[in-house]
Amino acid sequence: MYDWIVVGGGITGISLSYELQKAGFSVLLIEQHQQLQGGSSLGYGGISYWAGSTSVTQQLCYEGIARQRELSNELGIDTEFREIDLLLTIEPDADPQEILSQYVSCWIAPTLLNAQEACDREPQLNPKGIGGALLFPHGHINLDSFVSAHSQAFQKLGGEIIYTKVDRLLIEGDRLVGVLTEQGEFRSNQVVVCAGAMSRSLLKASGIRSRIYYTHAEAIDTEPVDLELRSMVMPADTKRYQLEGATTNIDQDSIWDIAGHELLPPSVDAGAIQFCDRRIRFGQLSRVLTDPYAAIDRIQSEAAIREQVSKILPKIGALNGKWRNCLVAFSSDNL
């Protein structure tokens, strides 16, 4: 009998498991894959601590970035945390002031740069491909290092990790009593589901409806390269957020339980990040498909990513790399 069971070993699940174990609870973390396959496996690793727009989210941003700055020392393993520039590119035909107004409520206000100023800050940018950019201070971690560091620290404190699939939650009467897995039952009165995009199907199998959704995210990873990208680059007008907002209508919620639907056409948010070991990840193409196991034409996807990225980062769009994909969860409340 454990005090807590955490389902899902991505950045959310492993962070929570570590903090609970550190607080003195007995914790079992259950993760399906020894090599992560969800959003934590393909994220850029950016920390948008500037983005808080309410008193609560601003407090979370303030406390969160302070925590990130000290974690490597506490864990004894480098998460590769660093402070970098974030450049949110503005399309050539967009109104910079209108784009800027979308960020007026942020905890830290951006600096509006014209195209030449943005290219001075990030020489890899194509001045003819942008109308300017918004500059933010930004945090960045290597998600693989972050998860690995927490995993080792969690286990040193006595936490347990089991790699198996959770089939459903165990409910007796009106009480949650544990989980049923491919390795049998594990008991606890406190279960936290941190399974990302797979949370919806897990909760449904347990008789619980939830408004959790997902996109199919696709990006390209390179090997370490000599080319240098100083900043994290992303679009100021992110199409993925528009996709998410357009697919969470409560009247259409049931369609997410029927595989085979494409709710909106795919879109690309052109951006890139270079990691400390000089690998570059660029993308991101997003699809809204109701089947988490849908087959995707990787050749077509890679071509679409390269076409859009090459418009703003031409040298990066031409780099050799490996196409990858994962599911990225989102909720109905913009969180």
Model-derived features: positions:
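Beta1/beta-strand and adjacent pyrophosphate-binding region of the FAD-binding site
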Residues: 1-12, 28
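Glycine-rich FAD pyrophosphate-binding loop
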Residues: 22-41
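Dinucleotide-binding Rossmann-like beta1-alpha1 core, especially the glycine-rich loop
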Residues: 45-121, 267-270
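Short hydrophobic core segments
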Residues: 5-7, 179, 186-198
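Active-site substrate-recognition segment that forms the wall
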Residues: 18-19, 47, 79-81, 186, ...
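Helical element adjacent to the flavin cofactor pocket in flavoenzyme catalytic cores
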Residues: 134-189
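Conserved Rossmann-like nucleotide-cofactor binding loop
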Residues: 12, 35, 198
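Short beta-strand to alpha-helix junction loop
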Residues: 59-62, 88-96, 133-152, 295-301
